[in-house]
């Protein structure tokens, strides 16, 4: 084979490779033609696209293919935008930061997630042999897992208490530190200042997002006598009907899950009214969760086992999805 033939063959292979790549792209680009009398919104919905999310991009991709007021034209093939299928949240840690969007069940919902204590305040402390379990570390891990669940259903999530070094951890005994911040700001030692700081952070975000469904979720672990076992329970502010409904939906979902996975166990989680600082001072409807007694060895299994932390977060998220559906 002479040099000219080799060059020609390489050129043909490169051209073929380019055509193959183009073909693959073309194959993955979704197109469709409208049905008689079908409007733009119905066309998007029939093809599995959220109207408010994808309408503008659809119009941009199909410029000059519309009738009056963006009416669809029969016989015209319209191109659909690529769906966003992943979102990045670095606070979840290297292994979890890329979250796949599984569906749009929470599209339009905004959540402000606060894990209890943090920074100079570890919260309740339990001793297991030589190990110290700090409330803030376990509440933070469950909160991150909850954030991941909510993001996977296409919610908007603000993580208020943050530790850039931790991410979701799969250890039983979580290392303790004081690196947590409130949206990047140092957490004060004074309790009232600390609580007001996180309320201010939520309210500042809420100023620009208050037209939609917005909820605050605060996660803590309780500390009682070693012999006291408790189930997850939830607080809402006395005058907040929306906070009460959210709390009740979550507790109802937890009861359903425990009844299914542990028949005969029973579930005594409750919803109660409280005038706690963060419930009173955050403007969006809020729910305050206590996940169990950190001093009780059986309750601790709910926190020590990573699979249990994951399950609790997922079940809470399912209850939150139910509440969002009720708001529509």
Regions found by a protein language model. Name each.
Residues 72-115:
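Non-catalytic propeptide/linker segments at domain boundaries
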Residues 26-50:
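Primarily a LysM-type cell-wall glycan-binding module
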Residues 2-13:
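Bacterial N-terminal signal peptides that target proteins for export
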Residues 56-69:
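Short acidic beta-strand-loop surface patches of small beta-rich interaction domains
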Residues 208-209, 222-225, 261-328:
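Active-site-adjacent mobile loop/cap segments within catalytic or ligand-binding domains
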Residues 21-23:
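N-terminal signal peptide c-region/cleavage motif recognized by signal peptidases
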């Amino acid at each position: 084979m002479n040099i000219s033939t080799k060059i020609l063959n390489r050129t043909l292979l490169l051209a073929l490779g380019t055509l193959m790549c183009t073909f693959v792209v073309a194959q993955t680009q979704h197109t469709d033609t409208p049905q008689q009398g079908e409007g733009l919104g119905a066309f998007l919905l029939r093809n599995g696209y959220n109207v408010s999310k994808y309408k503008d991009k659809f119009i941009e991709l199909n410029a000059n293919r519309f009738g009056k007021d963006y009416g669809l034209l029969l016989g015209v093939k319209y191109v659909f935008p690529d769906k966003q299928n992943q979102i990045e949240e670095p606070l979840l840690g290297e292994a979890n930061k890329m979250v796949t969007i599984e569906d749009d069940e929470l599209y339009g919902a905004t959540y402000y997630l606060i894990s209890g204590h943090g920074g100079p305040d570890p919260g309740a402390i339990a001793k297991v042999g030589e190990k110290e379990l700090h409330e803030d570390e376990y509440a933070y891990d469950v909160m991150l897992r909850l954030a991941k669940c909510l993001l996977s259903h296409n919610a908007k999530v603000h993580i208020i208490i943050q530790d850039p070094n931790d991410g979701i951890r799969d250890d039983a005994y979580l290392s303790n530190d004081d690196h947590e911040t409130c949206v990047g700001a140092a957490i004060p030692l004074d309790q009232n200042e600390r609580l007001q700081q996180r309320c201010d952070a939520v309210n500042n975000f809420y100023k620009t997002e208050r037209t939609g469904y917005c909820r605050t979720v605060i996660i803590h672990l309780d500390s009682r006598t070693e012999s006291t076992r408790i189930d997850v329970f939830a607080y809402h502010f006395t005058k907040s009907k929306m906070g009460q409904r959210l709390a009740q939906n979550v507790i109802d979902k937890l009861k359903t899950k425990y009844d299914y996975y542990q028949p005969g166990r029973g579930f005594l989680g409750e919803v109660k009214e409280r005038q706690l600082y963060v419930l009173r001072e955050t403007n969006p409807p809020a729910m305050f969760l206590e996940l169990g007694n950190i001093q009780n060895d059986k309750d601790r299994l709910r926190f020590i086992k990573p699979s249990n932390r994951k399950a609790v977060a997922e079940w809470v998220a399912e209850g939150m999805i139910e509440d969002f559906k009720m708001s529509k």
